[in-house]
């Protein structure tokens, strides 16, 4: 079992993982005018770069839960953050639209499992009575990342250039990864693994519930705007 204190520490780390996820993806959006001008990109070329991220992110967002189930949240999130941080760092070395698109594709692939993993971790490691606030805390980091991205990225770019901005945000991911591994230090893997006999529900049973269908419809309408 995980102590209550360690459970909250892990939830705070999940919060920062979500924040970094939404911070890293917005670096390009903030710096796009400068990068487009430097590489002489057209609107069509830039749209392809954006699509590369959206495509891989969408695919891995769908299958991210499977990844977390297969690897476990402990290792799965470490792999996710480590992978997207490397992809973010790769942005600092791109030489044109093609390499930029590849970096965006791998960034999306790494970030896709992050939110499913954050929700899964909050549910697994928190007492049932506090799971609601734990999930809310873990996922609200996305709003923080979106909010601080523009001023932070502009400030870094003014001092280090646009390539330095990508490298700096990648470094934040490396710091998070070290903190994540330290948080599990001395904790047996079995302590973070939920019981195998936990009741499960089929997709058919879930979709048969009207509240689930309404929630899916609401998210379908809301998420593209968000």
Task: Give the location of each predicted region.
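Conserved MFS/SLC helix-loop-helix module at the cytosolic interface between two early adjacent transmembrane helices
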Residues: 59-98
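Helix-loop-helix hairpin linking two adjacent transmembrane segments in secondary transporters
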Residues: 138-182
């Amino acid at each position: 079992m995980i102590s209550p204190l360690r459970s909250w520490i892990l939830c705070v780390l999940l919060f920062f993982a979500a924040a970094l996820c939404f911070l890293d993806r917005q670096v390009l959006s903030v710096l796009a005018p400068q990068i487009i001008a430097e590489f002489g990109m057209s609107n069509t070329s830039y749209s392809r770069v954006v699509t590369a991220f959206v495509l891989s992110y969408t695919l891995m967002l769908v299958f991210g839960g499977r990844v977390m189930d297969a690897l476990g949240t402990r290792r799965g999130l470490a792999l996710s953050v480590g992978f997207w941080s490397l992809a973010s760092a790769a942005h600092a070395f791109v030489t044109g639209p093609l390499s930029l698109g590849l970096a965006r594709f791998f960034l999306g692939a790494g970030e896709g499992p992050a939110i499913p993993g954050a929700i899964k971790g909050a549910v697994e490691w928190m007492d049932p009575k506090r799971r609601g606030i734990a999930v809310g805390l873990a996922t609200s980091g996305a709003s923080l990342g979106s909010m601080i991205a523009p001023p932070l990225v502009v400030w870094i770019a003014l001092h280090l250039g646009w390539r330095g901005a990508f490298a700096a945000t990648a470094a934040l991911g490396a710091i998070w990864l070290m903190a994540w591994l330290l948080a599990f230090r001395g904790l047996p893997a079995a302590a973070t693994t939920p019981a195998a006999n936990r009741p499960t529900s089929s997709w058919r049973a879930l979709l048969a519930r009207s509240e689930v269908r309404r929630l899916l419809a609401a998210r379908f309408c809301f998420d593209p705007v968000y």
